Amino acid sequence: MIKRFSLLSFVFILACSIVGCQQIDASQEQKQFDQFIQQEFVKTMESDYVATHIYMQNPESFGIDLSKTEVSLGARPNSDGEIVTAQDSDNAYNTFQQFHRNALTEEQKDIYDIYEYQASLSQKLNNEKFDYYGSYFESMSGIQFQLSTLFADWQVRNEKDVQDLITLLNDTKPYVESVLEYTKKQEENGLLMLDLESIIEYCDSILQPGENSAILASMNTSVEQLSLDTEKTEKYKSQLKEAFSSSFLSAFESIRSTMETFQKTGRNNTEGLAKFKYGKEYYELLLQQSIGSNKSVEDIREMMEEAFSTHLYNCAKIVISNPESVEPLISNTLPKTGYLSYTDILDDMKNVISEEFPPVSNLNYHIENMNEELASKSGVTAYFNIPTLDGDSVKQLRVNPISNDVSSISTFSTVAHEGFPGHMYQYAYMYENVESNYIKALSNISAYTEGYAVYAQYEALSYLDGVDQTLLEAYKENELATYCMIILADIGIHYDGWSVEEFKEFMESKGFSLDDASIQTQYAQLQANPAAFEPYYVGYHEIISMKEDAQQTLGSRFHEKEFHTALLESGTAPFQVVQRHIDAYVEKNK
């Protein structure tokens, strides 16, 4: 025992002496880390034409070699359904892990933690036991939606973009066929989990107009706005029409046909991920990917249970204390905001948020009606298009021209979420104040971006001077209680394995009595889109928790604008990074 202790002591001393001889040159470490992150940014962009086009007007100025970029819709699933091979991912992650975090600058530590969070989760999800667990055809955000929106909103800046757009359209059929092959293998392995009827209905809505599609019309308009000579314009429009018919529409016909076959003879799991062998483990990783932290399913369940009780209590308290004020909420006769246009809402918000949010020099924006064909079937009020990292910095908002009442509280809330002080403002602040292109383009922490936008939409309610604030507070608490319940149901379906009947019993236990058709619709939406709502409402509760802690610690020294600066200054990041910035703000102002 004594000899063993002596040997271990010697090894420990030797190790310490070796480390002592290998002191890290912090400036060199920082330089190499910047080079690694830049290489990752360039490598990602060069391998993804669509991302390059969306984020950059002049890719060469970012170090992108366009000769290495294939004009296509992206990499296809391999035999195991992976887009990026585990080896490629592991090689980059292994290189990353050689860096010494303590030698980095504070901004680099943020980037380090973002990369670590994303890469470690990706590595776990790429485990071969999860082969064919991921779905390409989720009913809320599957490729059937992504493709139609992508082409309807595609930015054409020059003649080369038109040529590339035609190439992309022609790539739709082969891309979709590769994804359908993957989906067929899912079914063969007993891992299919789709809302088949909703996919078929969406395909029908795309196919029904045929070549009279508003999507094709939108692309034609983009070509016409370049003011090329008439011969070229007509040639490109003819090529677009041919590609749209033979590739885009044909791809949707293939999707529809495959889903119909699954309906007739396929094995399709109509319950949650818990029904699969590794489903609970897979769901927990999906959950962590969607919440911006490594909290467990049980942590989130407890968070949502507590939040649900709090929101329900707050709502009941308001109703009891102010029955007349909240009667419009109970009777579903909410008052109008008085706004007559989306522009009026955004211009007002741009002016009033300056008291509580940090200044941004460029809040220029442009509103366009969303594609009518997509608007008519989506029910979406508005959405924000991510701006390029370079270019004129004008923010783009798409709004629904046909299905929403601009003067409703709901529309105001959505425009605040997508516009000011939500996504549009957050991106404007980030582009102006965060230097790292990696954070701006490749940090995909939806719990931060969506959680912040939900927080922003509820903050904006306080600016509605013409509506009773007591009513608006009850409106907010009622909505948040409902969404907490939906996240609890998502956990119930995918982690606990609830059936439709168990879901119905849960809803009734929370005081929500729905007819069977509504129960089935809500269950199907949650079942086909695991962890889809968590970014919004877990993200919101993470932010509001940080705010309440800061308010409690600082008391009268708490200031909204300084808190919002701390909340925004990291850019898109997991909450451990955001918390560090909030902690620094609190420590500075104690």
Task: Describe these PLM feature segments.
Residues 8-9, 422:
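Intrinsically disordered, low-complexity segments enriched in polar/charged small residues
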Residues 23-590:
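N-terminal maturation segment of proteins
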